């Protein structure tokens, strides 16, 4: 089962928590959920070049706090904060709450599964050999301290007539171990031959304590992220 299921969903409530962190009654829940979906769609569309890994949405009293985890915070903020002001206005058009946007810089994008998957997808679109792109990503992750990494690429790889799946793994990736800190990301490459799917699993060690916020704390305390910048 651990081989098939999304490893993030499998570990929710154990060592990983949700990216939407709020509670609402049944009358409000549907409306707020649709707002979250629209906010994420707009931010991913506007920040294509900013290497955004995660968008966390919290809703304290009459506020909407959006935390953007990005490898390029300068692209998000823009010159003198101009771009982030535009983002805040676009998000404010969706929700009636006061919008606060925070930015967290990811210092080691090579250890973030979503960013690794997007990087490989972009290389496939530029016609880089898929084996070279996969091998380079694996070597970078292992060099920076990952305990294991697995990458799957599927589709008409290299322009082949018949679609197939190729994978590459180094180190351990224990998908059945619930205490394992496994990051998972997917991306799609739109090539001239059709779409190619990229999946990445990165094993960063084990989290022994039962704490849904453990992964966030590890990112904040380690080298993966710098202190957050408030852009209220």
From Swiss-Prot:
It comes from the Bacteria. CDD domains: KH-II_30S_S3 (cd02412). This is Small ribosomal subunit protein uS3. It comes from Rhodopseudomonas palustris (strain HaA2). Binds the lower part of the 30S subunit head. Binds mRNA in the 70S ribosome, positioning it for translation. GO terms for cellular component: cytosolic small ribosomal subunit. Coiled coil: none annotated. Keywords: Ribonucleoprotein, Ribosomal protein, RNA-binding, rRNA-binding. GO terms for biological process: translation. It holds the Pfam family Ribosomal_S3_C. InterPro entries: KH_dom (IPR004087), KH_dom-like_a/b (IPR015946), KH_dom_type_2 (IPR004044), KH_sf_prok-type (IPR009019), Ribosomal_S3_C_sf (IPR036419), Ribosomal_uS3_bac-typ (IPR005704), Ribosomal_uS3_C (IPR001351), Ribosomal_uS3_CS (IPR018280). Residues 39-107 form the KH type-2 domain. Belongs to the universal ribosomal protein uS3 family. The keyword rRNA-binding applies. Part of the 30S ribosomal subunit. Forms a tight complex with proteins S10 and S14. HAMAP family: Ribosomal_uS3_B. Gene3D superfamilies: 3.30.300.20, Ribosomal protein S3, C-terminal domain. One of its GO terms (molecular function) is rRNA binding.
